[in-house]
């Protein structure tokens, strides 16, 4: 820098000694002023460069400290060193640019006439240099932050690895006892003759000759038994099953009930190992029909319909004791039929015959919904009280309807109940099925029906 100043001074003296005009002096003064500004700028740049070199020196010290503290993280330190090398390269670029600036000043010695233009160019380059130096400062701050963060991460990783190594050192199995074998990181059980692992990887005894009565069930060894004759009690003892232990008592019972001698007309016939008990009878008078012993010739006893009945004790015929009034009952499924709806409901109907009429008394019952028409069916083939035949319910006439009745009902729709009535009439009896036609009445929308007790009757001789 001092050489540059001396050179400029010599040039100024040379110009002065040549007797330039006042205008030249003015230009020289301007040049001096610009040179002073350039000198001030160069000094400021030098100070900035010195500051950067100081920061680089501090950074080198910190990098050295990091290298000594985290030697095991060489890869990351290498990256930091490459970053520092990049910074050094940037500083070398700055030195190169400063050398270029010196070269340009040397050119200014030879081209003093173009000093204004060179000075402007120098100011522009100096401004760019300041920008680059500021960028370098920012990069150094980012690098410092990154180094600090990476160092903390490295310390945390080292601490975690140290904890895991401590755990491994504590839990690691280095030797095994008798019956075990350690191969690398695996521990095996030494299995001798007479032992094996089942499909659940459980060590078991190996019995090669289980036919002798021993075997395994789950994880236990048991005695093999024939469960048809033997079982285990609550104490694990082998006991006889009931079908075996009860044989003596059953044998004694059979022996006690054995018939050795029979009286006529019975006789015992033996054929080989078979003993047959036979009934002796006179074939002229008796015959076995459908495994039943009957007379070959007998009088046919007539059958009687109500109100007549046969007293088998003395073979006498008399008026039935329930003539004029006879009680009974039928229980079964009340069927409802329409082309689009069909359901069954269990009901119990009390039967009462008065003279030549059969009265059906229905108790209170509930059913599913009905339509405005349809028919109800009672099947008297089954469900009648003892003494009541299916034919005793057959009507004595085929007039349709045989009779009608008004049935009080309630139509139910959710919580709503509507009182109503239906007109029912006995229409037909066919092979024990009595049809009751639904002729109409009041009607409303509903889901279920409650039927009040009702009676319906029709002519019937029984």
From Swiss-Prot:
The keyword Transport belongs to this UniProt entry's keyword annotation: no
User: Where is the stretch described as Tail?
Assistant: 1-317
GO cellular component entries: viral outer capsid
Modifications the protein undergoes after translation, according to the UniProt entry: Undergoes dramatic conformational rearrangements during viral disassembly in the endocytic pathway.
Keywords, in A-Z order: Capsid protein, Coiled coil, Glycoprotein, Hemagglutinin, Host-virus interaction, Outer capsid protein, Viral attachment to host cell, Virion, Virus entry into host cell
Gene Ontology biological-process annotations: cell adhesion; symbiont entry into host cell; virion attachment to host cell
What does the subunit section of this Swiss-Prot or TrEMBL entry state?
Answer: Homotrimer. Interacts (via the head region) with human F11R.
Q: Which family does it belong to?
A: Belongs to the orthoreovirus sigma-1 protein family.
Q: What does this chain do?
A: Fiber-like molecule that attaches the virion to the host cell membrane by binding to the primary receptor F11R/JAM-A and to sialic acid containing proteins (coreceptor). The interaction of sigma-1 with F11R is required for NF-kB activation and apoptosis. Binding to both sialic acid and F11R is required to induce maximal levels of apoptosis.
Name it.
Outer capsid protein sigma-1
């Amino acid at each position: 820098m001092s050489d540059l100043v001396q050179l400029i001074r010599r040039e100024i003296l040379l110009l002065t000694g040549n007797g330039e005009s006042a205008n030249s002096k003015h230009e020289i003064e301007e040049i001096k002023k610009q040179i002073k500004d350039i000198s001030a700028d160069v000094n400021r740049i030098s100070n900035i460069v010195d500051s950067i070199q100081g920061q680089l020196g501090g950074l080198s010290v910190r990098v050295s400290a990091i290298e000594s503290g985290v030697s095991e993280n060489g890869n990351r330190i290498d990256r930091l060193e490459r970053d520092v090398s990049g910074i050094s390269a940037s500083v070398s670029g700055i030195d190169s640019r400063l050398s270029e600036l010196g070269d340009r000043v040397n050119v200014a010695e030879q081209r003093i006439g173009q000093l204004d233009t060179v000075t402007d160019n120098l100011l522009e380059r100096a401004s760019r240099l300041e920008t680059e130096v500021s960028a370098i400062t920012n990069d150094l701050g980012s690098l410092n932050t990154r180094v600090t963060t990476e160092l903390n991460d490295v310390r945390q990783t080292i601490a975690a690895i140290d904890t895991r190594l401590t755990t491994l050192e504590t839990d690691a199995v280095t030797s095994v006892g008798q019956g075990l074998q350690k191969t690398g990181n695996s521990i095996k059980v030494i299995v001798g003759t007479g032992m094996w692992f089942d499909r659940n990887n459980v060590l078991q005894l190996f019995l090669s000759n289980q036919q002798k009565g021993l075997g395994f069930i789950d994880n236990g060894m048991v005695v093999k038994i024939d469960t048809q004759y033997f079982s285990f009690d609550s104490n694990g003892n082998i006991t006889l099953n009931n079908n075996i232990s009860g044989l003596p008592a059953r044998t004694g019972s059979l022996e006690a009930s054995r018939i050795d001698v029979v009286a006529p007309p019975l006789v015992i016939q033996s054929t080989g190992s078979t003993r047959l008990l036979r009934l002796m009878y006179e074939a002229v008078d008796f015959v076995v029909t459908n495994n039943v012993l009957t007379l070959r010739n007998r009088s046919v006893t007539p059958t009687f319909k109500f109100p007549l009945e046969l007293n088998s004790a003395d073979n006498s015929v008399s008026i039935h004791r329930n003539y004029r009034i006879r009680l009974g009952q039928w229980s079964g499924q009340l069927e409802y039929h329409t082309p689009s709806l069909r359901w069954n409901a269990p009901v119990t109907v009390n039967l009462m015959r008065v003279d030549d009429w059969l009265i059906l008394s229905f108790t209170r019952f509930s059913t599913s919904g009905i339509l405005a028409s349809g028919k109800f069916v009672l099947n008297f083939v089954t469900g009648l009280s003892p003494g009541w035949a299916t034919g005793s319910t057959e009507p004595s006439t085929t007039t349709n309807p045989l009779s009608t009745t008004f049935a009080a009902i309630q139509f139910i729709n959710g919580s709503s109940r509507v009182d109503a009535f239906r007109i029912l009439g006995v229409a037909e009896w066919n092979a024990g099925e009595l049809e009751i036609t639904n002729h109409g009445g009041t009607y409303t929308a509903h889901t279920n029906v409650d039927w009040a007790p009702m009676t319906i009757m029709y002519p019937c001789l029984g």
